[in-house]
């Protein structure tokens, strides 16, 4: 019986034997594709190739792509573990043709791999295929060429209410590449319920789709017209877990080897013998998605990708709690995961320490509130009358205890109770940006400039070149010429201008010819061409014209300083903080650099100093900065670090600054590190959960920054009548003096309050025989108000007191009730009556409660409302 790892390797070996390039799985974080939250299909990494915006050195490819399908509030997460085939993480085997082979080969390849005794040897009589209703070509290939009998071929038409809206017609979007598809199904046997595709029983588990082959042969225009593509392509997907279930003769994906090993390990760790418990399946699934997401740079947080990861982790932790886990357990599954994933586990193994650390920290954080949240939820569920948990309670669990909505829904599902999601949405309105980041990932690919050919980049050695204008664009539309005063994007056949990539800003400069001047303000890359963005200030510029392209050399030099310094900074961060440090983003400009990186804990001042010291040591060492092109495998063997979010071809450019820093990089750099002069870190802090940011300046900017700091120190010393070395001691003396003065002032305030309290006791009024004091004391802080309430209680013996003060645009409120009256009046209720009038809220004990507010102009009205309310309560 083949293992999952063997089936994965067999697929890749088969297609390699058919002339396909074996391409590594791309990251779960889509590279340069903001339309996607996570990689969810094998074709994602080839999207630009299918769109004609990218070219590869091969026309056939095969992959074992890691995928995650979980995101947004409305998803299948709650079904994972409860059905046979729902997963947050899965592997999609795929083979792709980029204008190479088409239907005949794609169909025959799939059939050979599935049925040949050399490969999977599936019984042909167990296989059924579907084709798009009008795709006679695919039908005939299956029937006449492959030999599949007619009764095993099903035509599927437009079954989704619109033309070309069908299970057997695939489209990338409303416009763009699209085409019919053919799907292959496996019959698990009549002992399992379910019907053939296209029948009312098709959702059963008897006939399971194992392979989908998409024929991209049309380009759909905005008016719905279908144009034939000049070079049709093929995109296929075979679910590895589903295929393994077929070959291992089981009906559920959770019964295959990798899941059974994980399930048994979970049971061992949490101490259960019930291997059929669905919570084990949930945890076994979730460790795969969580470990690979963290390995690919995602950090648990409250927004976007990080929030999806947090939801999955917390769901797993909750199911561990159901199984009786008494301590952190989730991270302990990582070694077993690496083992069962075999070759595909190397991504997690390389980041194992960081993966385990982040999983443990997240579980520990959630464990602090999980028990209390479940107690609240259990109490609320016991009181549910109509079978629906209120959205208000669901939101409180989210806001106070960190329960994602789907976790609450998971618990409710076990009690056959629904959740009022509309009510939850209303409560979430003020925090709508959380968990909605997924919907903000969008880009209209039709607006991107497309030009055939490519621009030859000459900027590694030149800052000036003669170049031919191959295209001009205004407002996204191609034009033949541009006149003075007009903005445009100029495409050149060759250019010394660097287009923004890898965090480095695009070059600026000018294009000139006789009587012509075009100011280049930025340079961007569109597919394989460079767009020079700017304004024509003089003359007329036309397609076909020869111009002199001249980069702003000084701006570029400053940018080069910062780019090389960024490499040294990255290396220093990894050396001081640990190898878990990975780039999450960067900005390299002519005025400074910004570097975002993975770091779950705050960076200490001592660590910052050591990082800065290391960088400047290697600057002073004046290392040569060497660039070399080589294969990806060779670069990795030399220890080269790849940067986050960048795509690399088969040949990569490696930038080396002694053994200290070796990175893959296509950017511009100095010739020796000594040119950088100096690096000064000017800020460091958190930008998101688990992500830190360092900002720094170099060269002349660093010197200017230090001069400015020196000036500030000198001015501060003058103000304090001190010299600079004595400033810390002088400031400490000043702080001590201020503290002493503040203490004396507080004592005076309290003394005055005691006197005022005596006067207020005389102003008490009787409401139904109870002494009541309501008064406004502007300038009194919360501490003074507490002293006054205690004093009034002592003087009056039995009383209700409501005091308020306004200062600096803020309101302080306090309510006090003597013990004999708390059965009638509670201080917390009284203070909230007042707080509502001043835009605040508060709380406390029945005998003493405080509140704040932001509307001092309503304070007098609040005290009147308090008196009126007391008349109804006493």
UniProtKB/Swiss-Prot annotation:
Organism: Actinobacillus succinogenes (strain ATCC 55618 / DSM 22257 / CCUG 43843 / 130Z)
Family: Belongs to the class-II aminoacyl-tRNA synthetase family.
Pfam families (UniProt xref): DHHA1 (PF02272), tRNA-synt_2c (PF01411), tRNA_SAD (PF07973)
InterPro entries xref list: aa-tRNA-synth_II/BPL/LPL, Ala-tRNA-lgiase_IIc, Ala-tRNA-ligase_IIc_anticod-bd, Ala-tRNA-synth_IIc_core, Ala-tRNA-synth_IIc_N, Ala-tRNA_ligase, Ala_tRNA_ligase_euk/bac, DHHA1_dom
UniProt protein name: Alanine--tRNA ligase
Domains: entry comment: Consists of three domains; the N-terminal catalytic domain, the editing domain and the C-terminal C-Ala domain. The editing domain removes incorrectly charged amino acids, while the C-Ala domain, along with tRNA(Ala), serves as a bridge to cooperatively bring together the editing and aminoacylation centers thus stimulating deacylation of misacylated tRNAs.
Catalytic activity as recorded in UniProt: tRNA(Ala) + L-alanine + ATP = L-alanyl-tRNA(Ala) + AMP + diphosphate
Cofactor: Zn(2+)
A GO molecular function held by the record: tRNA binding
Intrachain disulfide bonds: none
GO biological process assignments: alanyl-tRNA aminoacylation; negative regulation of DNA-templated transcription
Cofactor: how bound: Binds 1 zinc ion per subunit.
Keyword DNA damage: no
Localization (cell): Cytoplasm
Keywords: Aminoacyl-tRNA synthetase, ATP-binding, Cytoplasm, Ligase, Metal-binding, Nucleotide-binding, Protein biosynthesis, RNA-binding, tRNA-binding, Zinc
Residues that hold Zn(2+) according to the record: 563, 567, 665, 669
PROSITE patterns: AA_TRNA_LIGASE_II_ALA
Highest taxon listed in the record's lineage: Bacteria
Free-text function comment from the UniProt entry: Catalyzes the attachment of alanine to tRNA(Ala) in a two-step reaction: alanine is first activated by ATP to form Ala-AMP and then transferred to the acceptor end of tRNA(Ala). Also edits incorrectly charged Ser-tRNA(Ala) and Gly-tRNA(Ala) via its editing domain.
GO cellular component, one term: cytosol
Broad class of enzyme this protein falls into: ligase
